[in-house]
Amino acid sequence: MKTGIAVTVTLACLIGCTLLLFAGWELIIIGALCVLFAFLYTTGPYPLSYNGWGDVLVIIFFGFVPVGGTYYVQALTWTPDVTIASFICGLLIDTLLVVNNYRDREADARSGKRTVIVRFGEKFGRYFYLLLGISASLLCLYFLREGHIYAALLPQLYLVPHVLTWRRMVKIHSGKKLNSILGETSRNMLFMGILL
């Protein structure tokens, strides 16, 4: 596994270095932080994913870094729209982590992994999933302020499959059957990406 991580990180660094042709040296800092937190996520004396930081890291490194970073490399600036779009994407991707942690909550508790669901309980996990999707949709309404009517209103359609998936998750409650919720959540994320 360590070899796979090393190969992946090396390839990511090589690809990331090509972005330096389009943007400045500050990308080196962002890239170094990405590599550092990739290792700190599950290794070291204080593995972040084992101590309830997984959700925060997902929002940062799957929301702000890729969405904002991509925009920055192309435009060499950062706008409030980019901040909101980055946060929306981070929240959506975190729904996938929440389903995973919800499914694994009992095993995580036994192994000492203190995810937010282990810390705050199964009921919290259910509503956390629902809240992430609703928050992402409602944040899209910000785009009305900028005159982007479709970017504000179309994503509200995401709420339908999100709530339906949440209801199924609550009914299934535990076990391997929750794997189907991972698939539905991924589908819902793709749907939101198309709508946005």
Language-model region placement:
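Extended hydrophobic alpha-helices typical of membrane-associated regions
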Residues: 145-196
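Intramembrane alpha-helical segments
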Residues: 1-80
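Multi-pass membrane catalytic core of lipid/isoprenoid biosynthesis enzymes
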Residues: 1-23, 114-147, 186-195
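Structural signature of hydrophobic alpha-helical transmembrane segments
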Residues: 23-34, 86-88, 151-156
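Small-residue-rich segments of transmembrane alpha-helices in multi-pass membrane proteins
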Residues: 56-71, 89, 118-122, 182-196
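Alpha-helical membrane-inserting segments
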Residues: 18-19, 66-73, 96, 139, ...
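Acidic (Asp/Glu-rich) catalytic motifs at the cytosolic membrane interface
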Residues: 95-117
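Transmembrane alpha-helical segments that form the membrane-embedded catalytic/substrate-channel core
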Residues: 35-45, 64, 68-69, 87-102, ...
